[in-house]
Regions:
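Asp-based phosphoryl-transfer active-site loop
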Residues: 2-18, 39, 68, 193, ...
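Short loop/turn segments at strand-loop or loop-helix junctions that form parts
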Residues: 5-10, 70-73, 80-81, 128-129, ...
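Mg2+-dependent phosphoryl-transfer enzymes with acidic/Ser/Thr/Gly-rich catalytic loops
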Residues: 1-2, 20-21, 183-185, 189-251
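Phosphate/oxyanion-binding active-site loops and adjacent basic polyanion-contact surfaces
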Residues: 16, 44-48, 98, 185-189, ...
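A general structural motif
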Residues: 2, 34, 63-65, 129, ...
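A short, Lys/Arg-enriched amphipathic alpha-helix followed by its capping loop at the start of a domain
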Residues: 2-6, 23-35, 162, 199
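Conserved acidic, metal-coordinating active-site core of Asp-based
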Residues: 112-113, 117-208, 219
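Active-site phosphate-binding/coordination module
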Residues: 19-121
């Protein structure tokens, strides 16, 4: 039996940038009785807290079975049930020079392609320490507007390719619904899975990963290419259904 269930966040556990539903919160609480849970996604730790932690009304024992990997696995947080607080295990921070070059490249390419927002809702380019993220409509745009902006991913891929040419020493990925994420090369969701394996002293066969962008080029694809068993989902309801099936089988 698998030991860890790992998940992307947006469109896997929740609507993009939204808190998990009551149904998902209840289901994850049940899952934590039998499995460790890892969540790996592009947002900051504060976003994880808003979308997941604050919605899970669980005890310290279950919290200690959560493994949170913000900014695509460039950071790793665990809950200390003695100190009753979250602790960062590592962070692969970008240098100031790397951040400046990425910021300039993102704005240059987005403007040249006509994708720089004139009326953004929230930050357009966000320094997340270990990652720089471009949000085409602004971080706080509504889910409806985000889903409508680039349904076939052509805009994001065009920005990604243009930025990658300007910063070849860094990793440029199409991230969430409207975002481009830039980190150090080789620091991706597969890197996060390896860190999880090392920390828990398990093998990749012990992990089952749920993601909505498992196709080649998607930001979940590195996990699949790494050799972890994966389940493809397209919305959080798919994930809940599969989790309920797993729980029914093992009980």
């Amino acid at each position: 039996m698998k030991k860890v269930l790992a998940f992307d966040l947006d469109d896997t556990l929740a609507i993009t940038k939204s808190p998990i539903s009551d149904h998902m919160a209840e289901t994850l609480s049940k899952v934590l009785e039998d499995f460790d849970i890892c969540v790996i996604s592009g947002g900051r730790f504060e976003q994880f807290k808003l979308q997941i932690i604050d919605r899970l009304h669980i005890d310290a024992r279950k919290l200690s079975r959560l493994h949170l990997m913000p900014t695509c696995g460039t950071q790793y947080y665990r809950y200390d049930d003695v100190e009753n607080d979250w602790h960062q295990l590592y962070a692969e921070n970008l240098t100031d020079d790397e951040k400046n070059r990425v910021t300039e490249a993102l704005e240059k390419v987005a403007r040249e392609l006509g994708y720089w927002p004139e009326n953004p809702v929230g930050e357009i380019i966000e320094d997340r320490g270990t990652q720089v993220t471009f949000s085409a409509l602004g971080q706080q745009a509504t889910p409806e507007d985000k889903y409508a902006w680039d349904p076939d991913n052509t805009k994001k891929l065009a920005i990604r390719d243009g930025v990658a040419e300007l910063v070849p020493d860094l990793e440029v990925r199409a991230g969430g619904t409207t975002s481009i994420d830039v980190t150090r090369i080789g620091i991706d969701k597969a890197y996060g899975m390896q860190k999880l394996i090392d920390t828990l002293d398990i093998s990749k066969e012990d992990i089952l990963f749920f993601g909505d962008k498992l196709e080649e080029g998607g930001n979940d694809y590195p996990v699949k290419a790494f050799g972890v068993d994966c389940l493809d989902v397209s919305k959080w309801e798919d994930t809940v259904t599969r989790l309920e099936t797993i729980l029914a089988v093992i009980k």
